[in-house]
Amino acid sequence: MAYAFPPAWIPTLPIRGSSDEFPVRRIYCVGRNYAEHAVEMGHDPDKEPPFFFQKNPDNLAQTGEFPYPGATKDVHHEIELVAALSKGGTDIAPDAALDHVFGYAVGLDMTRRDLQAGVKKLGRPWEIAKAFEKSAPISEIVLASAIGHPSSGAISLAVNGKTRQSGDLSQMIWKTGEIIAHLSGLFELAPGDLIMTGTPAGVGAVARGDRLEGTVEGVGTLVVTVV
C-alpha cells in the first residue's frame, strides 16, 4: 500500500528520565473547573458543571516559544495540570480511573479571548478561540509512578516575574479521576490522550516579548516566551 501523500507526523511529548516519547492522540480540555475562574468568566459554578472541548494534537508547542496568533488582539494565558493516559476505554469507573494515567505535565491553554467572546454570544463552538496553531504549550511528562496522582499542591503562572494566576489543585471542582470517568462516558478514551484539567482564576492577556512561567507543585515548570 502507498499513501496518496506523506502522512502527518505524530505529535509527541518528552518523558522525564526517558529517551522514549509520548505519542499524542487527542487533547481534551475541561472548562470552568475552578470556581473562582468560572465566576471571573461570568458563570455560576454551582449551577454550571465543567464541560469539555478539544484542541488538535498538532496544536502542541514544544519550542519554548508561543507565536502570537493572527485574527486576534486579546490572547490570554490559562495554566493547567495535564493528565496523560496510557490506557483507554469507555464508561470507566471512578475508582479505577487513575489507573489509566501514565503521567502528568504542566500545560497552557492559550485562548483568543475576543474570538471566544464572539462565538459565545452566538452560541457557537469555541474551536477558533481554543484550537489554533501552537495553542497548547505542554511540558515534559513526569511519570505517575514517580509522583503519584496530585490532588493538592500549588498551581501558578507568572508573567515577566509577576504572579498572575495562583491556586491549588485541591480547588478543582471535578478531580482528575472524576474527569476521566465522566469523559469516558462521552468519548472512547485511548492511550495517548491528554486531558487539560482546568485553570484557576487570574487569566489575562499576553503580549509579544512576555515571558510566561507556569508551575504545578510536584510536577514541574513550563517556560514560554511570546514571539
Regions found by a protein language model. Give the residues of each.
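Extended, compositionally biased flexible segments
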Residues: 1-101
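Catalytic-pocket segment enriched in acidic/His residues
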Residues: 2-21, 33, 37-46, 105, ...
